[in-house]
Amino acid sequence: NSISQLAGKKVATTTGTTSVQLLRKHEKANGVNFDEVFGKDHADSFLLLESGRADAFVMDGSILAGNIANAKNPKDFKIVGEVLSTEPIAIMVPKNDPEFKAAVNAAIAKMVANGRMPALWDKWFLKPIPPKNVVVGLELSPATKNAWANLNDKPAEDYAQKK
């Protein structure tokens, strides 16, 4: 369950995503050679795996979990291996509108404090989603819990640094 096990395999990811850069970085750093295959979007990348044209699909856990939940045979797939990166998810606001930014930050902080954020996580990742009642099945990670406990404006580069 490590990236070294991808040696000689066909590894799918989605064109234009940070996963492409991440795969190449790990390939170079670890001396692991694999064949990259690209999907035009996440559904296409998953189809490469589902149809046997790829041996693995590297992407964000939430995207992988969603694709697995909606697969023809979800039990045929699982998320394995090490976390390859931690990347912040953010809300983009106009650069020169500090009042709006403050309002957005306050709304997020309130949602975390009053339990709405974890309730939304449960709704979209742990409970059946109508109309097909698909359950994504993605548990809340320690990294996400920590991010909610420590809301900030740190740039993505700060998350890549090992502490």
Identify the function of each model-found stretch:
Residues 19-38, 68-73:
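Ligand-binding cleft/hinge of the Venus flytrap
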Residues 36-51, 85-87:
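Short helix-initiation/N-cap motifs at beta->coil->alpha
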